[in-house]
Swiss-Prot record:
The gene is Gr59d. It comes from the Eukaryota. Keywords: Cell membrane, Membrane, Receptor, Transducer, Transmembrane, Transmembrane helix. One of its GO terms (molecular function) is taste receptor activity. One of its GO terms (cellular component) is membrane. It comes from Drosophila melanogaster. It is found in: Cell membrane. This is Putative gustatory receptor 59d.
Amino acid sequence: MADLLKLCLRIAYAYGRLTGVINFKIDLKTGQALVTRGATLISVSTHLLIFALLLYQTMRKSVVNVMWKYANSLHEYVFLVIAGFRVVCVFLELVSRWSQRRTFVRLFNSFRRLYQRNPDIIQYCRRSIVSKFFCVTMTETLHIIVTLAMMRNRLSIALALRIWAVLSLTAIINVIITQYYVATACVRGRYALLNKDLQAIVTESQSLVPNGGGVFVTKCCYLADRLERIAKSQSDLQELVENLSTAYEGEVVCLVITYYLNMLGTSYLLFSISKYGNFGNNLLVIITLCGIVYFVFYVVDCWINAFNVFYLLDAHDKMVKLLNKRTLFQPGLDHRLEMVFENFALNLVRNPLKLHMYGLFEFGRGTSFAVFNSLLTHSLLLIQYDVQNF
C-alpha cells in the first residue's frame, strides 16, 4: 500500500506539472519546492494553449449539436451555461495560482515539514488518498471514453485539439481538488496522532491518586510537559489549516460551483438519454452504460471529498471531548497539570476549527445537506421544464 501511495503522489505531481497547476518545481529527492524559470515557462505555455483552443472552440458550431442530433434549445442553454461557468471558474482558479504562487510554495514546504516530523500520519490517511486517486482516474477515463465515442465519426486533428482543451479543464479541476484533499487528509492524520497521545495522557491522569509525594509530583510534571507539547502542536496545526483555507478559499468556491453544475448537467443528460434515446449514429449501449458508471463515480468522488473534511472536523471535536474528561479527574491534582488542561481547553473554545470560504458558507454536514437538497430541487425543475415544453 505504501508503494501504491507513493506512485499515486508521483502521478499527481506529474499531472499537476502537465496541466500547469503546479507552477513550481519539486525536488523529488529532498521534497523542497522551488520557483524556477523552466516550471514557469511550462505552466504559462500550457495555459495559453488551453485557453487559445477554447477561444477557437467558441467560434465554431455548437458541440452539443455535433454530438447529438436530438439536442434542443434547452440542451444548448444548459450546457452553454455549464461550459461558461467552468471556463470562468478554471480561469479564476489559475489566476489564484499565479497570484499566490509564493504562498503555495510556502504551504507545500510546510506540509513537507509536517510529514518529515510525523511520518506516521500516512497510516491514518493512506487508504483514503488511494481511494480518491482511484475515483479520479475512473471518472477521467470514462469521461474520455464517452467523449471520444460520441465524436468518433467526426474526429479530426482540429476536433481532437478542441476536445483536449475541454478535457484539460476537467483535469485542472481534478488536480486542484486532489491537492486540497491530500492536504486535508494529512492534517486529519496528524489530528489522529495528537488525539492518540491526548487519550493516553487523559487515561494516565485519571489513574493518578493525589498524595503529595515526590513521585506523584514528578508524574504530574511529566504529563503537563507532554500536554503542553500537544497543545503547541495543535495550535501550529490549526494555523496551518487556516493558511490552507485562505490559500484555497477562492479555488474551493469555484470548485463547489463547478461540481454543482456538473452534477446538475450530468443528471439532466442521463434523463435526456432515457427520453430521446441513443445519440446519433446508433451509439452503442455500452457507451450509455459508461456514462451511467461515470455519474456514479462522480457522485462517489463528491462524497469522498465531503467526508474527508467531515472527518477532519470530527477529529477536532474528538480532541475537545477528550479535554472535557478533565472534570472526571480526582481532586487535588498538581496545579500546573490542571492549569495546562484548562488553558488547552479554553484555547480550543476561543478558537474553534471552522472552515469558512469568503464568509459565503462554512463546511459541515448541514451545509452539504443543503447543497444536495438544492441540487435535487434544481434537477427536478430542469427535468419538469423539459417534459412540459419539449
